[in-house]
Amino acid sequence: MVFFPELEQARLLRRYKRFLADIELANGEQLTIHCPNTGSMLNCMREGGQVWFSRSNDPKRKLPGTWEISETPQGRLACVNTGRANALVEEALRAGTILELAGFELLKREVAYGEERSRIDFYLEFADGRPAYVEVKSVTLGFPDTPVAAFPDAVTQRGAKHLRELAALARQGIRAVQLYCVNLTGIEAVRPAEEIDAAYAQALRAAVAEGVEVLAYGTRLDARGIVIDRPLPVLLNP
């Protein structure tokens, strides 16, 4: 995924009302931009830290830009725009980068499924007619002195619901995959954030016991673009 034009750099003044952020450009100009992240953004932003944002040329937009990347307190880079994860995964799927899911012949987005009326991020179908349901989560939570990232960064009942739906598919013999897109530099593994959401961690382990596949992929990212580039281990019982 290439950012065009290249992202602009600024200094974060504050994030507020969840979806708003005030930033200051190098020339002293201050802007209010959109924050496309509903999570707590724990450990992936700091007031006064560096951020990178994209500008919009749409005159109908109320805000001139979107916050894309943040410098974390640990000096890493995090893609805080959670909407990028699905686009990155689709790009990687079509390129064959995610080897565990290579060789599909059909890809559909946002397909309805399950008893709890969920929508799967990606429905894949292979040459022999076998389907695979793939749920994507964006990971940006890192910690000092460890290369292990964690998910989620806030309690997520929705995330636990998705795991239950995937587990129900697996019980029927249908391939179900939870894929973590790690949009954070300097990471070597992923784990459930049990200290933040124990119910989610338990749901993840239960889903794996039912046959759900859990994958994680890391990214390279900077102001020019982001690309999924390597598989990462998932530590279910760190």
Curated annotation (Swiss-Prot):
Family the UniProt entry places it in: Belongs to the SfsA family.
GO terms assigned for molecular function: DNA binding
Protein name in UniProt: Sugar fermentation stimulation protein homolog
Superkingdom assignment: Bacteria
UniProt xrefs under InterPro entries: SfsA, SfsA_C, SfsA_N
Organism: Pseudomonas entomophila (strain L48)
